[in-house]
UniProtKB/Swiss-Prot annotation:
Gene that produces this protein: yfiH
Organism lineage: Bacteria, Pseudomonadati, Pseudomonadota, Gammaproteobacteria, Enterobacterales
Organism per entry: Escherichia coli (strain K12)
One GO cellular component term: cytosol
Protein name listed in UniProt: Purine nucleoside phosphorylase YfiH
Cofactor: Cu(2+); Zn(2+)
The reaction(s) this protein catalyses: adenosine + phosphate = alpha-D-ribose 1-phosphate + adenine; S-methyl-5'-thioadenosine + phosphate = 5-(methylsulfanyl)-alpha-D-ribose 1-phosphate + adenine; inosine + phosphate = alpha-D-ribose 1-phosphate + hypoxanthine; adenosine + H2O + H(+) = inosine + NH4(+)
Role played: Purine nucleoside enzyme that catalyzes the phosphorolysis of adenosine and inosine nucleosides, yielding D-ribose 1-phosphate and the respective free bases, adenine and hypoxanthine. Also catalyzes the phosphorolysis of S-methyl-5'-thioadenosine into adenine and S-methyl-5-thio-alpha-D-ribose 1-phosphate. Also has adenosine deaminase activity. May also act as a polyphenol oxidase: able to oxidize syringaldazine and 2,2'-azino-bis(3-ethylbenzthiazoline-6-sulfonic acid) (ABTS) in vitro.
pH dependence of activity: Optimum pH is 5.5-8.4. Maintains 80% activity at pH 5.0-9.0.
Record note on temperature dependence: Optimum temperature is 44 degrees Celsius. Maintains more than 80% activity at 50 degrees Celsius.
Annotated Pfam families: Cu-oxidase_4
Sorted UniProt keywords: Copper, Hydrolase, Metal-binding, Oxidoreductase, Transferase, Zinc
Length: 243
């Protein structure tokens, strides 16, 4: 059976959300087994079966709107097909039954909703998108005030495994000097805490109800795919929608 993660947060009645793991699919190594990514070399039939299993396990009301993620900061407002382009790293919806989704395999998935349960969003935040402002752009799509927005940080590479060069630290500090607290020197490189960086960015725009951020895709190899660990691997996905 497909194993799902259900966010532990004060979710409004009108909102549903879940995040997949690598457990419960049909894909063969190195995509074993619940790979949802059709772009990483897996058998397309296996990916389709995995998606069917996931949609059933998560009780999704419709097929998710899959994005063409490019490590940027653009947000696609889900108003119904057809879309001129799905090239974006976040999606927003205020329409019941429309599923926001992002794929990850180390990058940070962030799910959003407002306390009233009338708006939702999902963002893909790798370090480039996070630094460029994808979370801030997503928050700006909400009609509600930032203090009424909840954010859940899904499974990403943890602070003991995310080694980066000095240029990554410098890029974040150029935007916010407080970002230095999220980097620890590790030889001639740094260990970066993507969860802390996300919390800083969200707090800077008034979002302070932040949950999750306690898993590591890199070290929890039996539960999660990790691009940095395995290079050729599958993808998880995180979903949120209005009921």
């Amino acid at each position: 059976m497909s194993k799902l993660i259900v966010p532990q947060w004060p979710q409004p009645k009108g909102v549903a959300a879940c995040s997949s793991t690598r457990i419960g699919g049909v894909s063969l190594p190195p995509y074993d087994s619940l790979n949802l990514g059709a772009h990483c070399g897996d058998n397309p039939d296996h990916v389709e079966e995995n998606r069917k299993r996931l949609f059933a396990a998560g009780n999704l009301p419709s097929k998710p709107v899959w994005l063409e993620q490019v490590h940027g900061k653009d947000v696609l407002k889900l108003t119904g097909e057809p879309y001129a382009s799905k090239r974006a790293d976040a999606s927003y919806s205020n329409t019941p039954g429309t599923v926001c989704a992002v794929m990850t395999a180390d990058c940070l998935p962030v799910l959003f909703c407002n306390r009233a349960g009338t708006e939702v969003a999902a963002a893909h935040a790798g370090w480039r998108g996070l630094c460029a402002g994808v979370l801030e752009e997503t928050v700006s799509c909400f009609a509600d005030n930032p203090e009424n927005i909840l954010a859940w940080l899904g499974p990403a590479i943890g602070p003991r495994a995310f080694e980066v060069g000095g240029e990554v630290r410098e890029a974040f500090m150029a935007v916010d000097a407080k970002a230095s607290a999220a980097f620890i020197q590790h030889g001639d490189k740094y260990l970066a805490d993507i969860y802390q960086l996300a919390r800083q960015r969200l707090a800077n725009v008034g979002v302070e109800q932040i949950f999750g951020g306690d898993r590591c895709t890199y070290t929890e190899n039996e539960t999660f795919f990790s691009y940095r660990r395995d290079k050729t691997t599958g993808r998880m996905a995180s979903f949120i929608w209005l009921i």
